[in-house]
Structure formats: C-alpha cells, structure tokens
Design a protein with these regions (language model features):
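Glycine- and acidic-residue-biased ligand/ion/polar-headgroup-sensing regions
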Residues: 140-143, 149-165
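Short Cys/His-rich Zn2+-coordinating modules
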Residues: 13-22
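Double-stranded beta-helix
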Residues: 197-220
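Positively biased amphipathic helices and basic secretion/translocation or surface-docking motifs
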Residues: 1-8, 22-24, 33-36, 40, ...
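Short beta-strand His + acidic residue motifs that chelate non-heme Fe in jelly-roll/DSBH
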Residues: 42, 145-147, 166, 184-190
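Ligand-binding loop in jelly-roll beta-barrel domains
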Residues: 182-205
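A short glycine-rich, His/Asp/Glu-containing loop-to-beta-strand
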Residues: 111-141, 146
C-alpha cells in the first residue's frame, strides 16, 4: 500500500499540541496508524515538544499541557499498537484502524448504517465533539458523489477502495484535506466500494437543488 497524500504540517502540529478537538483527532490518528512517514514526523514534533517542556519553567506551562501531550501519545499508541487485536475481525477486512473501530459495533452487520440515497450509507461516530462531526461512509463502486463545496474544513481518510476528484486520486491510507469553498465531485473507483472516515465542521454545499432540499433528512 503506497500512501501518497499526507497530513499537513499545520494539522500535525495542532494534533501534537493537543489543539484539535475529538473528531479531528480521530481522523489524524487514523491516518497515523496507516502512514509510517507521518508517524515519523509526529515523533519528531513530540521530541521537539519534549525538549521545550524540559527547557520551560513551570510558570510558562499551562495546567493541562502535560495531559494534552500524553493524550495524543496514548491515541497514536493505541491506534498503532493495538490494531492487530482490534482488527482481528470484520474491521480488518475494511482496513478500519482501532481508533475508529472503538467507536463502532463489533460486527459490521450490526452497524446502524443510514441510507443517504444513491447507495451511499453512513454511520455517525458518537463523540463528545460539538464543533465537528465524524462519520464512516460506504460509497458503492463506480458511484459519483454529488458535486459540492464546503462551509469549512473537511478531512477524509480512506480505509478501503478509493476515489478520484479534481484534486487527485486517493487510495487506502490516504488523507484528503479540503478547506473553505473548495469544490469537488469524488468518483469512487470501479470494482470496490469505498469505506472512508469523513470529518466536517459544517454541512456540505451541494450544487444540485434536489440534494440540498434533502439535506435536513440525510444529515450531511
């Protein structure tokens, strides 16, 4: 598996410093569990952060800085070190890492998939995050997602299958970061359904009027 699309330096820095909320952190940790290159970059940031902590006086450190750093280390350690244990069943067949599987049922047949139309299904992860939503998506092979833009940032991590859009081609392990009003229309590859994690901070802006009218019902 060759990963071509990686985390931005800004995302890695925010994650390492504990600045990301739960939903965004899940997406970053999911990619880190797949990508050795980004794990190495993350380790360097942690090393730099550790040096800064050592050189700082107690007055310069916030009360929760240590807990933030330790929390990030625990998340990555769990998603990487426990992946075999957590993914010994159905999750491994979809490439879903433990950091995501922990939010899901033990059996894919028991997942509360919600039909969004056109064969697309979702499961919204139950997090405590009030600023962003994380959802597992299943999109049929060969399907085009309706053309849309965004009201904010969107992160998508591919677990199985893949898609292409105006920004490139994405496969297992890749992460796509979309900002602001960027427009695209993902097209899932033929031959295999696409299973991915998508995190958004605001509803999508669909070009098709009918899809926009249905948004309150499908919740995306």
């Amino acid at each position: 598996m060759e990963i071509r699309h990686h985390l931005s330096e800004e995302l890695l820095l925010d994650y390492s410093s504990g600045a990301l909320s739960e939903a965004w952190s899940i997406a970053v940790a999911a990619h880190l569990s797949k990508c050795s290159r980004c794990r190495a970059s993350h380790a360097k940031l942690e090393e730099i952060g550790g040096s800064l902590l050592t050189d700082s006086t107690p007055e310069e450190l916030s009360d929760d800085i240590f807990s933030n750093v330790l929390e990030r280390l625990d998340e990555v350690g769990a998603s990487v070190g426990n992946e075999i244990r957590k993914n010994s069943g159905w999750a491994s067949s979809y490439g879903i890492p433990s950091v995501v599987a922990d939010y899901l049922a033990a059996d894919t047949k028991k997942l509360p998939w919600k039909n969004l139309g056109l064969g697309v299904s979702q499961v919204v992860l139950k997090t405590k995050d009030k600023s962003a939503t994380a959802r597992l998506l299943k999109i049929p092979a060969g399907r085009k997602v309706p053309h849309h833009s965004h009201n904010g940032r969107e992160l998508t991590v591919i677990f199985s299958g893949g898609f292409s859009d105006e920004t490139g081609s994405y496969g297992p392990g890749d992460i796509q970061e979309i900002h602001g009003n960027a427009e695209h229309q993902p097209w899932v590859r033929d031959g295999e359904d696409c299973i991915c994690l998508a995190v958004t901070e605001a509803p999508l802006k669909f070009s098709n009027v009918a899809v926009r009218l249905a948004q309150p019902l499908i919740g995306i």
